[in-house]
């Protein structure tokens, strides 16, 4: 998109381009306002701030509360919470989208609280189907 050339400036060596004229070509003609949420989400994923998991929740009272209190941090945000399929009376798989700065800490808390989970990313075949 049009922001690509400007974003690339961050990767240039500042000393190497000092006192030189740098030109960034902005177009963005293939973009419209409807694509901005997608672009913002891809940026958050690239920066490691947004993650998707399939988490197995026990079908018993207060399981979601346990997840929120014991797993999520103060600055974590649930951006998506969707039951995938209810085939088992005891457990249900949930697609959970999270914005967090501390992904490794979050995964450790999931393990400590006995949640079975799988992180899914753009390389997983199921990613485009679910996300």
Predicted regions and their residues:
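Short beta-strand segments
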Residues: 24-27
């Amino acid at each position: 998109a049009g922001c690509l050339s400007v974003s690339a400036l961050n990767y240039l060596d500042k000393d190497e381009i000092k006192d030189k004229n740098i030109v960034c070509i902005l177009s963005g003609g293939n973009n419209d306002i409807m694509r901005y949420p997608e672009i913002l989400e891809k940026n958050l994923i690239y920066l490691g701030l947004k993650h998707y998991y399939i988490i197995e929740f026990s079908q018993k009272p207060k399981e979601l509360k346990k997840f929120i209190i014991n797993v999520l941090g103060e600055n974590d945000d649930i951006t998506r919470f969707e039951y995938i399929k209810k085939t088992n009376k005891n457990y249900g798989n949930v697609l959970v989208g999270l914005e967090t700065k501390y992904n490794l800490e979050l995964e450790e808390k999931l393990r400590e609280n006995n949640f079975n989970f799988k992180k899914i990313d753009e390389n997983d075949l199921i990613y485009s189907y679910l996300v």
